[in-house]
């Protein structure tokens, strides 16, 4: 270790060690170049990179912060990952043998023997008053995660399942294969509702951005090129505007809901109460409106007008802390340069979190949070619990740690004996 040559440094995103052959790819069209046990190096990942990410021994990206796609998905997959490594794709060479120490954010030349810390094997608390949910998307991880001490799935992302289908839904519709898309999506959702039953599974309807949809097979034909997809054609607005594709999704939800009553439906990136009311009507007409409607709160307008949104009639609210933080602070969550400014503990964000939780509590609406912040900042978790949050959702690698944090906070507050 003393003589190890340090090649690249970046931000630790998913802890662990990985050793293997570097494979540099420019986009997801080159996914097949990444074989089992390779070190995936790229500028930035998107949902269509997932097949390659699952095969990688470790992942290194030039750009990104701890809430970027590569960071979130690698933690869920349990793959070591370093983000924001600047010129990694220029410094490292395809075929080069390296060791990735993702716990400390370092890449070394060759096969370096690094001792890893022992991981926690059990939680101190079997149960807490505040529910702990998992953020999940990969069906292959379901048996393992369903056996862990979690109270359900707080965020099942549609994008992972759709990326696995691999084709743009409009392309499948135009080819007369819309029913095939619906059945494949239903099969994916059913994997989760069945494994976690009777624990609830909160399914977030598709929230691909246009640049991500374009990467699906046939996507170039249907997706506009936007200057800023993050605040572009996405979320509830898209679902109303692209009714044909949304119908494929609601058909899948209706199929699953007939079999499993633990399914919940959550609408992402809602901008106005009027928009929410229209989506709710679509869901009611599609026969899935009775399955406990949730909304994501990630746009500042939703925080400010929360009472108006709740008046539309929702059963649950999930705080999308990653998008809410970046939109409140005007910082790019995918930028390594802005990493120090991206902080969920900023007073403006904390004000928003308190307002959301206390308003929901007053109105008798379930409120949760999805994101990494409660795992990173125990002091923030203490605030969330004290304000009355009902549940916290984290990626699978943070389940035991977060259960302990919640338990310690509740014990300190006298909630647990």
Predicted regions and their residues:
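Conserved alpha/beta-domain cores
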Residues: 123-417
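Acidic, glycine-rich flexible loop/linker segments
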Residues: 2-156, 166
